[in-house]
């Protein structure tokens, strides 16, 4: 029997659909209690505050505080980095050394720096000064060995992310520098897996056997841009992400994430979601601006049987004072919804130019749903429709 189409799943689906039916009324009731809906010039990174204001949400949220770091500071130049050269080893050496000494800041100074995968470590703030540009390699070898990641809501071992962390705490990526992904004529792009993730999993049911490393004819899965995984107390603040091969900022299985004052510019590159919250809890997203080739602010919790096996919801998420420019959806739930999306509060935002405003999408084989999803004071100037429910999307592309 297919476990994804039995009666318990139907009950979950019905609950989700009922929540969607009452959703416009929830919007109306909340909106009547507020004075104004923000204009575009009243949201986004230019208005980010120094202090993080208390979070007021219609559900319990912890106090959202930045991680605190020791005064120790290393420049990547001190560990051998030279402009226009590959500096992966120098950056990683600085991060590892600062973490080993109890934490502090690793500084990337102004200049163009070429790198492969960077792995953040506990108690380290990787800080890009204004004028600093990290240009990421498009070669597979620069992202090996493979690491655990989620690709479209399914666990695999592949390239992970351009900036990655696994099972770390008190980590940060900050500053006013830029991170720039490789172009789509690179080796990684040319060797990406050509079948849907469902087909791949059918061929590789054991998670430990899902190794996509590009060797001996194997494909790779496109790396995420920034993806802390199994981490606690994460801060991403101030940086700009450009181009991207795939989803941009994707915390996976994390607890306690703050994303603020971030700019994503990946319009024109398909499947480049802006911020995807993936089976992660206690999240604050504020003062961000996303211009994407896919959905902008997106909530996910795993896909199909694999998502049900992991069974980690995305919950307790607040999005405020943010701007969504071009993209498929301003704020989106799905399409990976297996472990549920709970307690989402989006308020005081502007969606300007997206194809839809608030979007729910999944398909029946993917499981789960959402509950207690609240949206208010959102200004929408859209290229399409305000509210979009797509429960029967295409297998590969929804």
Feature-to-residue mapping (PLM):
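A short, hydrophobic/aromatic-rich structural module that often spans a beta strand
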Residues: 180-204, 245, 250-255, 337-356, ...
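Right-handed parallel beta-helix
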Residues: 130-131, 169-178, 232-242, 255-266, ...
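A short local loop/turn or secondary-structure capping micro-motif enriched for an aromatic residue
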Residues: 135-136, 142-145, 181-182, 188-190, ...
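A short, flexible beta-alpha/helix-coil linker loop
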Residues: 80-82, 303-305, 394-395
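Extracellular "leader-to-stem" segments immediately downstream of a signal peptide or signal-anchor
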Residues: 2-4, 10-20, 24-107, 112-125, ...
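Glycine-rich beta-solenoid repeat tracts in large extracellular/virion proteins
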Residues: 117-120, 133, 137-138, 161-166, ...
């Amino acid at each position: 029997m297919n476990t994804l189409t039995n009666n318990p799943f139907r009950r979950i689906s019905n609950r989700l659909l009922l929540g969607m039916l009452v959703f416009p009324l929830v919007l109306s009731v909340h909106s009547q209690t507020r004075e104004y809906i923000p204009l575009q010039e009243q949201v986004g990174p230019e208005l980010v505050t120094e202090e993080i204001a208390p979070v007021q949400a219609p559900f319990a949220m912890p106090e959202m505080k930045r991680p605190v770091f020791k005064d120790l500071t290393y420049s990547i130049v001190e560990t051998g980095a030279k402009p226009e050269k590959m500096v992966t080893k120098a950056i990683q050496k600085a991060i590892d050394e600062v973490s080993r000494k109890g934490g502090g800041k690793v500084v990337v100074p102004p200049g163009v720096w070429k790198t492969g995968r960077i792995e953040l470590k506990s108690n380290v703030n990787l800080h890009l000064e204004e004028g600093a540009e990290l240009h990421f390699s498009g070669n597979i070898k620069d992202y090996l060995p493979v690491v655990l990641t989620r690709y479209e809501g399914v666990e695999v071992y592949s390239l992970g992310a351009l900036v990655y962390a696994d099972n770390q705490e008190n980590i940060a990526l900050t500053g006013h520098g830029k991170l720039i992904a490789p172009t789509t004529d690179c080796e990684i792009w040319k060797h990406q897996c050509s079948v849907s993730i469902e087909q791949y999993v059918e061929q590789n049911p054991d998670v430990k056997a899902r190794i996509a490393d590009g060797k001996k004819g194997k494909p790779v899965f496109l790396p995420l841009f920034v993806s802390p995984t199994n981490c606690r107390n994460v801060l991403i603040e101030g940086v700009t992400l450009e181009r991207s091969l795939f989803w941009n900022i994707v915390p996976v299985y994390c607890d306690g994430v703050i994303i603020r004052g971030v700019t994503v510019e990946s319009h024109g590159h398909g499947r480049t979601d802006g911020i995807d919250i993936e089976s992660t809890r206690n999240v604050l997203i504020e003062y961000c601006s996303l211009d994407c080739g896919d959905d902008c602010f997106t909530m996910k919790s795993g896909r199909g049987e694999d998502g049900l096996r992991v069974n980690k919801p995305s919950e307790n998420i607040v999005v405020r004072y943010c701007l969504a420019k071009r993209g498929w959806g301003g704020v989106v739930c799905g399409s990976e919804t297996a472990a549920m999306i709970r307690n989402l509060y989006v308020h005081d935002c502007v969606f300007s130019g997206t194809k839809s405003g608030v979007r729910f999408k999944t398909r029946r084989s993917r499981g789960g749903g959402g509950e207690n999803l609240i949206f208010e004071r959102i200004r929408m100037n859209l290229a399409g429709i305000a509210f979009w429910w797509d429960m029967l999307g295409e297998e590969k592309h929804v």
